[in-house]
Amino acid sequence: MATFPVVDLSLVNGEERAATLEKINDACENWGFFELVNHGMSTELLDTVEKMTKDHYKKTMEQRFKEMVAAKGLDDVQSEIHDLDWESTFFLRHLPSSNISEIPDLEEEYRKTMKEFAVELEKLAEKLLDLLCENLGLEKGYLKKVFYGSKGPNFGTKVSNYPPCPKPDLIKGLRAHSDAGGIILLFQDDKVSGLQLLKDGEWVDVPPMHHSIVINLGDQIEVITNGKYKSVMHRVIAQSDGTRMSIASFYNPGNDSFISPAPAVLEKKTEDAPTYPKFVFDDYMKLYSGLKFQAKEPRFEAMKAKESTPVATA
């Protein structure tokens, strides 16, 4: 099995730019995931985010999670659970408008830190989109422009903790799925593992690394690149000891963004290669919400069928 791709992003600014871009390209084509080091985000900021997130979980969410587990009898399950994930989460929205001030139980300093964290992640996401454009032969800013729609991108952060699980063989931390959106930036626990991706029919661990940011591609990147780059199935395995922190930020198209394979990519496709569908992002999300934990291919086929269905006129 090939080694999980780790990219030193600082090298794009020097003599190793071409080799670094090729490493990113190979990861996007063959893994759908890669891990960034020297990505330019402050390690002090990352340390603060981690400490505050873990403190917040202990103070306000751990007891609630224990009560939920007791109420559902999850300590004593005897057969595999298919409709529930062993995770404690809350969601922060940054763009097009922020909801950070509305989330209850967050200390003011934590709100401020997460706002700063989001600003830095947004910059990193847009830098990565431009590197993808360069690799794909698209004009600089193409992906950002597609994602903007009329009101800007959707950008938000899912803050998760995966507590120790008494039955990790029967309950997943997070069931297998591919992500619906654009580009996902994950700041994860560097001590407690659990994230896995599906590669060549086998589940592969995503290695926890101190101060790294794990990148994975969503379904929209697969569509825009007409399958050259892939979104891949991934999951979180619950652990019997240790609480795993996961802070995943999703830089997604705006609701009214029109998604379709990029013309410059289609020009290079072989004649027998299928063409991916065209659709409005919000329509895809409505479909995805009910089919998240299923294969992506039927979602693409459903959007293609919708695209070819004639609109009735009076």
Curated annotation (Swiss-Prot):
Pathway: Alkene biosynthesis; ethylene biosynthesis via S-adenosyl-L-methionine; ethylene from S-adenosyl-L-methionine: step 2/2
Gene Ontology molecular function, alphabetical: 1-aminocyclopropane-1-carboxylate oxidase activity; L-ascorbic acid binding; metal ion binding
UniProt GO BP: ethylene biosynthetic process; fruit ripening
Domain Fe2OG dioxygenase: 153-253
Pfam families recorded: 2OG-FeII_Oxy, DIOX_N
EC number(s) reported in the record: 1.14.17.4
Induction of its expression: By ethylene and wounding.
Domain of life of the organism encoding this protein: Eukaryota
Stored Gene3D superfamilies: B-lactam Antibiotic, Isopenicillin N Synthase, Chain
UniProt cross-references to InterPro entries, sorted A to Z: DIOX_N, IPNS-like_FE2OG_OXY, IPNS-like_sf, Oxoglu/Fe-dep_dioxygenase_dom, Plant_2OG-oxidoreductases
Similarity field: Belongs to the iron/ascorbate-dependent oxidoreductase family.
Subunit record text: Monomer.
PANTHER family assigned: OXOGLUTARATE/IRON-DEPENDENT DIOXYGENASE
Protein name, entry field: 1-aminocyclopropane-1-carboxylate oxidase 1
Organism: Malus domestica
